[in-house]
Amino acid sequence: MEGEKGSKTRKGDALAREKLLEIAEKIYNQFEEEVVPSVSLPSRTKANLEYSDESDVWVYGDRESERSAKTVKGAFQLLKTTYATDFLINEHLARNRGSTLRELYYISEGWDYAKFKEQGESDRLIEDLEILTSLQREYFHMRPEEDGATMFGPIEITEQTKRGERNIHCQKDVGEGGYQIPFNVENIEFQKHDASMIIAIETGGMYARLMENGFDEAYNAILVHLKGQPARSTRRIIKRMNEELGIPVAVFTDGDPWSYRIYASVAYGAIKSAHLSEFMATPAAKFLGLQPSDIVEYELSTDKLTEQDVSALRSELSDPRFESDYWKEQIQLQLDIGKKAEQQAFAGKGLDFVTEVYLPNRLKEMGMI
């Protein structure tokens, strides 16, 4: 097993090196041919999202933006691209090392004119390299700053670590917080499970409530804490459990426009990382709630929508990820009532209400129980 893992890692490193060298070679050849160096990338805007019938997720369309040395800004971007490419090849891949996104920003301080002005700039460059190579950043040994979230439920896994294999049952062998999802979930193998569903939960409070109330045992549910906008590793493990094990997924968030985007990132992918949608998005994931109609039906405690909330909801009406009749009706209802609610609002009906009344009713309505 360890030999297979090592061989797979070496093949991945060789592929990443080959793809990164192709970028450098293209720029070098443009110089040789006395052509102004440039690279083209998909435009990362909402207007350039297209639905892929093949994969059922939203991906980038044909609109492109050019990074060209014709301008000073473009020349600096290409310079930084070559420095980063050289660093990833010679420091990460050649020496089997890795860095966080934050570390890369600080490492660039030694790159003279290629130094990044802010971390957002270095983050975007790594995303550019993902697009240009058609590889995920993990192939370059780049690690995110944030941890993956946690999960708790009836599934047994094997995780490959630097210290060998770990066999873990995600109910019996973990503490109250659950199993910590690693940043590279390709190191996980699923062994066996008794799960009938996955509930991906936005807030830590609701995740803890479902665990305390025994919802995982009562409904054979794998509970996944999204920790707000989910990390890549969280989205990836949800997709893998859905596709490889056939476990249906429901996403349970707060009832506001920002939370609907959390659902969209799980189901369809995020706008800024649409190049990874086919790898991370779970188009079969269903939106459980909290729905605007739930606010009305259960007379939940609410807050008034802010101007930013209203603007975000109106923006979602033109977002291709929310173009279904269901979403248009729910968003319009929320605009009409002018209210939003948190998951924890169900506590106003009693600590057991969400697990004994709301979730069973909603899951039956969705055909999941």
UniProtKB/Swiss-Prot annotation:
GO terms for molecular function: ATP binding; DNA binding; DNA topoisomerase type II (double strand cut, ATP-hydrolyzing) activity; magnesium ion binding. Keywords: ATP-binding, DNA-binding, Isomerase, Magnesium, Metal-binding, Nucleotide-binding, Topoisomerase. Transmembrane segments: none annotated. The keyword Ribonucleoprotein does not apply. Mg(2+) binds at E202, D254. Belongs to the TOP6A family. Homodimer. Heterotetramer of two Top6A and two Top6B chains. This is Type 2 DNA topoisomerase 6 subunit A. The lineage of its organism: Archaea, Methanobacteriati, Methanobacteriota, Stenosarchaea group, Methanomicrobia.
